[in-house]
Amino acid sequence: MKFCCVSICLVFLYTGLKGQYTSHIVQLKDKANNVHKIQDPTTFLSAKAIDRRAKQHINIDSTDLPVSQSYLDIIRTVPGVNILNTSRWLNQVLINTTDAASLATINAFEFVVSTSPVAAIANPRPNNIINRKFEETITPLPDRSLINERNHQRQAGGETGNTINYGNNFKQIHIHEGEFLHNLGFTGRNITMAFMDAGFLGFKTNPAFDSVRLQNRILGEYDFVNNEPSVNEDHIHGMYCLSTVASNRPGSIVGTAPHANFWLFRTEDASTEFPIEEQNWAAAAEFADSAGVDMISSSLGYAQFVNPAFNHAYDQRDGNTALITIAADMAAKKGMIVMNSAGNSGGAGNDFRFVSCPADGDSVVAVGAVDVDGNIAEFSSWGPNGAGKLKPNIVSVGQGTVLANTVGAATSGNGTSFSNPNIAGLIACLWQAFPEYSNMQIIDEVQKSAHKFSTPDDRYGYGIPNFKKAFYSLLHRSFAASVSSAGCTTTIEWTSKDTRSMRYILERKMESDTGFVKVATLDGKTDSFKLNTYSYKDVLISGSPNEQVVYRLKQNVTADTSVILYTTTIQLTEICSLGDRLIVRPNPFQNDINFVLGSSTAISKLSVSLTDMGGRTLYRYEGSTLPGNFYLSIPTQSLSAGMYILTIRDSKKILHSRKLVKQSL
């Protein structure tokens, strides 16, 4: 695709040429006489937009106020002038007129700073800039759905055990370990994404989007090019991009955030190339902000225009100059994650090989392209930006990206237009898991997880993010713990995010131990992934004064993956001995029962039994012990919830009897 950008300062164009232009930006002086008040944002921001600001400690300020209605009313009185859209962030108005006298009238208004042309009548002759727009190649793929539907375990990459049967696009998710998030249930639910593009042809009937349509998760659409509420009949490019995220055809193609919500905006006119498209983008971003959107995925970019006078030289792609870049950075300032394709000009032999706008923005995540093996795509635009800032930020699969075609079947395409939404969807899933973190905190963790974070370069940026690594890093950030020790009793308290399917393993290492010994197993508490608090008391049955005891807490997130959350060391102050005592852990219990029997004498005929309240024996152990401590673990998976009796005998003499309670899982 062709990527372009335009300076917010367009007054360098010859004043004498203004008559040939059809659209202009009117820069306003202030927002005087505004009917809206910062103190009452409910009149111009949705509840979700206000909540986003509150969660991220973002103040509502004058840039949030709409353009003054009184100024718009005055501009509308000028003959031959139509208002197309406005930007409250930039305090400007986009108008349509070819009348020089009307422009002169507007420029004479006291509240107007300047007017600048941004569009002209399209030149009917062929133009290389337009011809290179949306030049990604699309290649049909064989349909794997019959194979995969017969065998859910047979994935396109040979992988097994995932909750989603991805089909053809598994590899472009697996390169980021994105399936790790999906397997935990994080599929973009409750995250709203806005797509900016040239159109979404046929999305209302495409089978790839059946789920998102039936569940009413396309929240709205708007065409800022034609000022109409439909994007279904325009260019196909946006549909391809959307399919990498929102498709849900198991065995053929499943997107990276198949349960997210979406707004679809047309801001790009594929038939021409003028800076008006950047103003459209700004207006759409502001609409998205007001509507409470969480993320923007934009597969557009600007550096060259039909009229070279609008071009942005490399030093102007500095993150602070282009209209669209300023708007994109402002969107990030309002708490949204802004994702944008880096550009497809990496093979250019001049300065246009560097990232376009708004990918040059300081707070914009510019996404380059690799293949599924992690090799950089030659077409992927280079960094840094014009100010020397690292770009692209990250990379994803943009060469051979699996997409949905017009009938919902899997096809393949090349371009950073596709690498961007592919990873944007995974970032949405990560944010779903950790919504308490700000947009920039999430991006920071994504970048830190990338494979070249410590050695970034101008092709990969920080590299290929790993979402398992990012998840564990955020889990660590959410974790808190404390330890206290009194005599031979150590109390460990902690707070961490979990679900019932997760488990904590507390381990201990005494100086006499060769390795860590499991002390306790605690299951997660809630169905939803949220913060829960735990406490465990460990009573030591051996140990000497000044001996150091190391505790380690692990969280099993899945059956085969765990993370060490906490390690701490305590020092004993007295001799610890069990004596003739019985310690049972845990009680109540959900899984195995672990107990320690202390005895000062040998037990020649040890008998351990577990019975229900009706006296039925459910478990029995017989053996003998030497003086000291005897350890035993009793499996209880087959037991129902209820009360049980643990009895320990020496021959027929009862040494200990303890009531135990099993809780439901």
Where are the predicted features?
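Substrate-binding/access-modulating region of protease and related hydrolase catalytic domains
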Residues: H182, T187-R189, N248-G251, L264-S363, ...
